[in-house]
Design a protein with these regions (language model features):
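Amphipathic alpha-helical binding modules
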Residues: 89-93
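Amphipathic alpha-helical interaction surfaces in cytosolic regulatory modules
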Residues: 3-25, 29-34, 40-88
Length: 93
């Protein structure tokens, strides 16, 4: 699971914050050609488009929407249909 140091944080925003979190905790840890799941902490209830584009931008650039639909899954207990939300917001990049 992703570690968000500030447990009081419930919303994630900011392209640079997304990139920083991805670089520190995900990059090099997953094989994008195999199924993988990103787990957000339970308290997170909102992902801003800016955060999504920063965090998932590299994955999206490397494997595209088709690759993400096939291999990517996400667990975010407080966000309804998080995979669709993320993919839809990446289409705006």
């Amino acid at each position: 699971p992703l570690e968000i140091k500030d447990r009081s944080l419930t919303k994630l925003a900011g392209n640079s914050y997304g990139r920083k979190l991805f670089d520190a905790q995900v990059d090099g840890q997953i094989n994008l050609n195999e199924p993988f799941t990103i787990v957000f902490p339970e308290q997170i209830d909102y992902l801003a488009s800016s955060f999504i584009q920063g965090f998932f931008g590299k994955i999206y650039t490397e494997i595209g929407r088709e690759g993400m639909e096939k291999n990517f899954d996400v667990i975010a207990p407080k966000i309804s249909n998080p995979k669709k939300t993320i993919l839809d917001r990446l289409m705006l990049m």
